[in-house]
Regions:
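Acidic, metal-coordinating catalytic segment for phosphate/diphosphate chemistry
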Residues: 2-44, 50
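Short glycine-enriched loop/turn motifs at secondary-structure junctions
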Residues: 9, 71-73, 134-138
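Conserved hydrophobic "DFG−1" position in protein kinase catalytic cores
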Residues: 17, 47, 56, 125-126, ...
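Nudix hydrolase/Nudix homology domain
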Residues: 28-31, 80, 107-177
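A short, polar/proline- and glycine-enriched secondary-structure boundary/capping micro-motif
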Residues: 36-38, 65-69, 145-146
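Active-site segment of metal-dependent pyrophosphate-handling enzymes
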Residues: 37, 41, 61, 83-85, ...
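A glycine-rich, hydrophobic loop/mini-helix early in the fold
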Residues: 42-76
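Short, surface-exposed loop/turn motifs that are enriched in glycine and acidic residues
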Residues: 76-82
């Protein structure tokens, strides 16, 4: 995912501000949401190819949040009035440079870095059987990794913290822990 961050879209984009139960309280510009650390919604999409490999990328160095870090999810902030599902499809299509992707919702959790950022994270999975043309503003480099390769890279590469947490929860969810 591209990690939801202050730089992942226009700061004047209007998003839903939500409460601890993920209920909409009001709308606000993204700049206000980040400035005041308001709880909001984000989507994460784990994209696999037909061989089960996972789209993994390095964020551009121009990103304000986790520049140059790696991620095994694509995604971003949910717009005001937008459903999690619609946002997951929109973000996956934008970041991968594709059309017609279908995502499957898996689980939701509240991410917090313990300091400043906090958001509801809706995790989806998708399979893509075709070429990708990743968005140059978001993706500096990409590859497709097996789960074993990804788990190995998690110990040697810098990964975005929310993507790391979403991957941990994904593995737990899948094994029923």
């Amino acid at each position: 995912m591209t990690t939801p961050s202050p730089d992942s879209g226009p700061l004047d984009e209007i998003v839903d501000v939500v409460d601890e139960h993920d209920r909409v309280l009001r709308t606000a510009p993204r700049s206000e949401v980040y400035r005041d650390n308001l709880l909001h919604r984000c989507v994460f999409v784990l994209v696999r190819d037909p061989q089960g490999r996972i789209f993994t990328h390095r964020r551009t160095d121009t990103k304000a949040f986790a520049p140059g870090a790696h991620d095994c999810f694509v995604g971003g902030v949910v717009g005001a009035g937008e459903s999690y599902l619609d946002a997951a499809v929109r973000e996956a299509e934008e970041e991968l440079g594709v059309t017609g992707i279908r995502t499957r919702p898996l689980f939701r959790f509240r991410y917090t870095d313990g300091e400043r950022f906090s958001w509801w994270s809706d995790v989806h999975e998708a399979e893509w059987d075709g070429p990708v043309d990743p968005q140059a503003e978001e993706v500096a480099w990409y590859t497709w990794l097996t789960e074993d390769e990804l788990n190995d890279r998690l110990t040697t590469w810098e990964f975005v913290p929310d993507g790391r947490e979403a991957w941990r929860r994904y593995l737990e969810q899948r094994t029923g822990r």
